[in-house]
């Protein structure tokens, strides 16, 4: 309803969607067009099964979730958007696959832990944007949870040169930036590293 009401496209966060296994669900990111129709969805591929020794945190997403097996992107009236979710950010191969589909922008909902976010969040987003010459928009959950877990926040928009266009650190809010597709095309033409890759 909100997409239709405000005439906007929405890349929603993740919701649990039934999978082929009765006891597990997919962590699914859904895209709505400005008419409120679901036009794309992506099942998170990389599940967060880690031990963070420094903070005594343990996560086992694979206990509850089934991993997805395919990339997802969608054509919009303004650009081609690729989808990723949270821990996917640590796997450059996913973004290279998306890049091979000529995406212009990655949209990624996330909930990095406070510890890993402080160390890696901005570096990884900028690296993925630079190495694929893409815009990157990530909505990031931040703050304390009832369980005591703390997430890092820092929703941000980064351009293909790795510059932060807008950021909101650790609170609710909205960030807005202009995506300049012509500038991106010129950058890809003048700095054609994607055409130079050998492996």
Which residues are covered by each model-predicted region?
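Short glycine/acidic-enriched loop and turn motifs that connect beta-strands
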Residues: 17-20, 144
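Short helix-loop capping/hinge motifs at secondary-structure junctions, enriched
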Residues: 37-40, 163-165, 184-186
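A short C-terminal boundary segment appended to hydrolase-like catalytic domains
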Residues: 182-199
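Active-site catalytic loop in hydrolytic enzyme cores
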Residues: 20-101, 114-118, 123, 189-193
